[in-house]
Amino acid sequence: MKFKTLFIAHVPDAESERDGCVLETGKYKLFVRLVKNQDEALKVVKDLVESEGIESIILCPGFTHKDVAEIQDAAGENVGITVARGDSKSSKIAMEAMKKAGWW
């Protein structure tokens, strides 16, 4: 049996059906999905928890506390939710890089 995790990131030009991959070893299966908005994130969560038995979800720092609560509700009480947040300096560096890439 493998530990199954889903990583979701907000990306302005993402299409969740197109932008994803699966990485896998004998003991670990990581699903990666890029989503444009919260509605796509919720759909991905519901679909993969049901179809793949996801046990843990990792979210990019762009998810708000409200978003995280909605994702927890969609995933169910038996799925762990983690948000990948950096310290102040790291967040600033990432924001500048995203700005240069044209995210906003």
Q: Can you name each region flagged by the protein language model?
A:
Residues 54, 100-104:
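A polyampholytic, Gly/Pro-enriched intrinsically disordered region
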Residues 62-63, 86-89:
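Short, ordered loop/turn segments at secondary-structure junctions
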Residues 23-39:
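Glycine-rich phosphate-binding "P-loop"
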Residues 4-6, 56, 78-82:
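Structural preference for beta-strand elements that scaffold enzyme active sites
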Residues 89-96:
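Short, charged, surface-exposed secondary-structure boundary motifs
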Residues 68-86:
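Alpha-helix-loop-beta-strand connector modules within alpha/beta enzyme cores
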Residues 45-46, 51-63:
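Amphipathic, hydrophobic secondary-structure cores in small proteins
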Residues 1-17:
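N-terminal basic/disordered segments at the start of proteins
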